[in-house]
Curated annotation (Swiss-Prot):
Protein name: Manganese catalase
Binding residues annotated for Mn(2+) 2, in chain numbering: E66, E149, H182
Gene name, Swiss-Prot/TrEMBL: ydbD
Residues at which Ca(2+) binds: D57, D61, N220, S222, G224
Role according to the record: Catalyzes the decomposition of hydrogen peroxide into water and oxygen.
UniProt region (Disordered), positions on chain: 254-273
EC number(s) from the headed UniProt entry: 1.11.1.6
UniProt entry keywords in alphabetical sequence: Calcium, Manganese, Metal-binding, Oxidoreductase, Peroxidase, Stress response
Residues that coordinate or bind Mn(2+) 1: E35, E66, H69
Catalytic activity: 2 H2O2 = O2 + 2 H2O
Details of cofactor binding: Binds 1 Ca(2+) ion per subunit.
SUPFAM superfamilies in alphabetical order: Ferritin-like (SSF47240)
Keyword Metal-binding among record annotations: yes
Coiled coil: none
Length: 273
């Protein structure tokens, strides 16, 4: 069950309208690593968690907060689009250079959403459920969460550098702070799960069933041997085994040769040599 509080978690009010920045801000709303993605990712991970109540609550708490961030950013986008001086835009558009800049505004904001946010990226790509990860393996999922928060915070930081609007910066500063917390919480939870299950996912798969002679080899597929300069090659692997550097990649299989396709699929016939 969800309950909507009719107040934002943090203010979302720009100093002035800016339809072009509204377009840019769509990325942290409906882009691959935007707030819609992390909210849905955490929700489905939480709903699918079995027998780990403290992690389920952690996921649901964070997911619910992210829904509030969706609301904040959508509100900010709408406010960046409202009160735009249309008469001034029309006059400015008579200049071909300025007109081309104004043409960079997201037309969806005017045509589709009526000066409101859309569930899409800054380039108009619709949000997709294919962006989310919810595997049922918490260690794998929490690593995906760490990546999502890292990419998301990076994009917010870049947006912060693109504006001088104090109201926008104020909200972005809050989002940066919350992403700092979320990165830290996933790092801490990952460390806890690694102590229980080991660092390799899934930790429940029998080692005897994998070809262990290849399990810790760093294979050089490049010219030169610069990849051998990794300091960690001289240390134990995170799972306690020893790393091995292979200077030159070797082949262990045969040349792949396929049978001709059956006539009914109408493939190109094999050439005669």
């Amino acid at each position: 069950m969800f309950k909507h509080t009719k107040m934002l978690q943090h203010p979302a009010k720009p100093d002035r309208p800016d339809p072009l920045f509204a377009k840019k801000m769509q990325e942290i709303l409906g882009g691959q690593f935007g707030e819609i993605s992390v909210a849905m990712q955490y929700l489905f991970q939480g709903w699918n968690t079995r027998g780990n109540e403290k992690y389920k609550d952690l996921l649901m708490d964070t997911a619910t907060e992210e829904l509030g961030h969706v609301e904040m950013i959508a509100t900010m986008i709408a406010r960046l689009l409202e009160d735009a001086p249309l008469d001034q835009q029309e006059k400015a558009a008579e200049d071909p250079v300025i007109g081309s800049i104004l043409g960079g505004m997201n037309p969806h904001h005017a045509i589709v959403s009526g000066l409101g946010a859309m569930p899409e990226s800054s380039t108009g790509v619709p949000w997709s459920g294919g962006y989310i990860v919810a595997s049922g393996n918490l260690l794998a999922d929490f690593r995906a969460n760490l990546n999502a928060e890292s990419q998301g915070r990076l994009q917010v930081a870049r947006l912060f550098e693109m504006t001088d609007d104090k109201g926008v910066k104020d909200m972005l500063s809050f989002l940066l702070a919350r992403d700092t917390m979320h990165q830290n919480q996933w790092l801490a939870a990952i460390k806890e799960l690694e102590a229980q299950e080991g660092p390799v996912v899934p930790g429940t798969f029998p080692k005897a069933l994998e070809k262990q002679e290849f399990s810790h080899q760093l294979i050089n597929f490049s010219e030169g041997e610069v990849s051998a300069e990794q300091n960690w090659l001289n240390e134990k692997a995170p799972d306690g085994e020893a790393f091995e550097y292979v200077k030159e990649a070797k082949t262990f299989g045969e040349k792949p040769e396929l049978k001709p396709a059956p006539p009914f699929v109408h493939n190109t016939l094999p050439g005669r040599e």
